[in-house]
């Protein structure tokens, strides 16, 4: 409130009033707090570790994630009530159809909620934090970037690290970057995206697929669509891990109804004919919910994914030749995506 408005309201200069002063004025009025979206510039964040081979350092391997999420809810909800409901009715969070719970399901929901109430009181929340989607992938590329930067021996090719914005609004950041890349787009030899790599254990209520719900489960989208050699290099890097992941290609199948191939940032590069893959530990009950919080992340599993991606990236960056493309380069990068 301005000094002039305060003087009008109080009937005296507010600086002349002592604490506890009673004023005789009565003021009435109406006010409102309008809520409207504000345009704000979002940014991709790009870093480069330069390659060591003069003949190859102008080629780039891209590693990516996205740092945006889906905002907040206008009305807060109880954290534990939502988790209990989703655990029973919507095990894939926002990708599960919304429907009423049956009588039997309400019994299970109340039992889960009763057990949670013994631990803590109700907690209202409206912020969709996105700890897994995609805080997990963002953390991973930062750790991988630090490992490459600190290594005394740099990879032969250069490595791009791109944290995209606008993924949740339709791959806007990655599409913009691929269309206006900071390096020649044809110099990017491959793209590895990490999106939701911090969950996927049995307690997250898996919904099927090879090895789903185990510590070794990992969804792989797009790895062999453009270059089988690229996919095989990633499989070889995985096989060298102390505990290899079980790669699940279920959601990469042509025509799969969930359309994962078209929904992750790797596709923005694939439409230019760049061998591209998206790694994920899978969806869960907190997907696009206010309950996607850091407390539910499995940090050891996240670190294992990041290590495997690092090793695969290093192998590709050091290979004598870039991954060989098996299909023609698309003539129109703006053509509709086909799962």
Residue ranges and their predicted role:
Residues 1, 31-36, 77-80, 88, ...:
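Second-shell loop/turn segments in exported
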């Amino acid at each position: 409130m301005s000094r002039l408005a305060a003087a009008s309201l109080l009937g005296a200069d507010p600086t002349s009033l002592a604490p506890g002063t009673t004023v005789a004025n009565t003021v009435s009025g109406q006010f409102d707090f309008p809520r409207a979206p504000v345009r704000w510039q979002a940014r991709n964040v790009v870093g480069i570790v330069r390659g060591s081979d003069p003949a190859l350092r102008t080629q780039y391997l891209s590693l990516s994630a996205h740092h945006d999420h889906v905002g907040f809810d206008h009305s807060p909800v109880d954290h534990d009530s939502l988790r209990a409901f989703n655990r029973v009715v919507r095990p894939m969070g926002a990708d599960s159809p919304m429907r009423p719970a049956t009588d039997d399901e309400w019994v299970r929901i109340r039992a889960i909620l009763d057990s949670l109430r013994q631990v803590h009181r109700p907690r209202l929340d409206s912020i969709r934090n996105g700890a897994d989607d995609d805080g997990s992938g963002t953390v991973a590329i930062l750790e991988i970037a630090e490992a490459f930067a600190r290594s005394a021996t740099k990879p032969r090719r250069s490595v791009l690290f791109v944290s995209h914005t606008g993924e949740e609004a339709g791959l806007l950041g990655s599409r913009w970057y691929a269309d206006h890349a900071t390096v020649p787009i044809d110099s990017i030899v491959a793209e590895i995206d990490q999106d939701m790599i911090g969950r996927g254990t049995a307690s997250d209520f898996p919904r099927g697929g090879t090895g789903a719900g185990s510590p070794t489960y990992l969804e792989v989208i797009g790895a062999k669509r453009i270059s089988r050699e690229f996919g095989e290099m990633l499989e070889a890097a995985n096989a060298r891990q102390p505990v290899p992941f079980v790669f699940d290609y279920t959601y990469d199948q042509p025509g799969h109804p969930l359309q994962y191939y078209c929904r992750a940032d790797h596709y923005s590069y694939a439409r230019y004919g760049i061998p591209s893959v998206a790694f994920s530990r899978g969806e869960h009950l907190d997907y696009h919910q206010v309950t996607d919080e850091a407390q539910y992340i499995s940090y050891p599993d996240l670190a294992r994914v990041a290590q495997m991606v690092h090793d695969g990236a290093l192998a590709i960056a050091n290979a004598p030749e870039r991954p060989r493309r098996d299909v023609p380069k698309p003539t129109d990068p703006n053509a509709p995506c086909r799962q």
